[in-house]
Design a protein with these regions (language model features):
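Sec-dependent N-terminal signal peptides
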Residues: 7-10
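Positively charged n-region of N-terminal signal peptides that target proteins for export
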Residues: 1-5
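C-terminal motif of bacterial Sec signal peptides marking the signal peptidase cleavage site
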Residues: 14-17
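A short, solvent-exposed, low-complexity linear motif enriched for acidic/polar residues
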Residues: 19-246
Length: 246
């Protein structure tokens, strides 16, 4: 009799857990340069170091995405292993319709890892494009680029020079520095409601990569930084101010 009673109680608890209301979220991705929407292929921007520049491509990975509620409880996104690839020239990547059944709640923060780590950042993890087009050379760590921003800047002689801001693992004195970093952003009045789809927009300010706490000057670092440890570390440090949620 006692055993049967426990089975009834357990079944009731399981049913209660299964019936908790859930909703969905859609994460959109946008790009600005300070207060203006990013326009590609137009040399109209100036960074804090005084470099005039244009942007031709922006591509990046985020991973380990999670929501945090009022009580500090976290909900880890498992759709696509918590990874999303963004390419400004591929409209389908600028919207992530997350398939997870997310508990109805008020969420105060969203957090994610900029880049990839562990098994997700090993060569061959992504078998198909466009993600596998982000492959990072095995000789300097393998895996994948975390970000590519390609464009041109005008150097001190007034000549338009190409730049490729490519970040990823890079060799250091003890092995490889992964150069990932965690971003945590506050959410204002964001609620997931039952059977509804709540929307967030993750906005990248391209100019912020060059600003704080360190100035990034193309005339100092040049246009190619894949094996430039100092330049990679500057971008990593500056990444804390790059993203906001709208």
């Amino acid at each position: 009799m006692v055993k049967k009673l426990w089975l009834v109680i357990l079944s009731a608890l399981l049913c209660s857990a299964c019936s908790k209301p859930t909703g969905h979220i859609t994460l959109n991705f946008s790009f600005v340069v300070d207060n203006d929407s990013l326009r590609l292929d137009t040399c109209m921007y100036q960074n804090a170091a005084g470099n005039l520049y244009e942007v031709n491509d922006v591509q990046y990975f985020i991973s380990k995405v999670m929501l945090v509620d009022d009580a500090g409880n976290t909900f880890d996104i498992i759709d696509n292993q918590g990874i999303h690839y963004v390419d400004i020239r591929i409209p389908g990547t600028l919207r992530w319709n997350i398939s997870d059944e997310i508990p109805v709640n008020h969420y105060t923060r969203i957090a994610f890892l900029f880049g990839l780590e562990g098994a997700q950042n090993t060569t061959g993890y992504f078998p198909n494009p466009p993600e596998n087009n982000m492959s990072w050379p095995d000789m300097i760590g393998g895996g994948y680029h975390y970000m590519k921003i390609n464009g041109r800047w005008i150097d001190k002689a007034g000549v338009r020079q190409p730049f490729n801001l490519h970040t990823g693992k890079i060799a250091n004195n003890t092995g490889f520095a992964d150069n990932t970093f965690t971003v945590t952003l506050p959410l204002e009045q964001f609620t997931v409601s039952k059977n509804s789809n709540s929307k967030l927009t993750l906005q990248m300010n391209v100019n912020a990569w060059f600003t704080n706490p360190y100035l990034f000057d193309f005339n100092i670092f040049g246009g190619s930084i894949m094996q430039n440890r100092e330049a990679q570390e500057v971008l990593r440090a500056n990444g804390g101010d790059v993203f906001s949620v709208k």
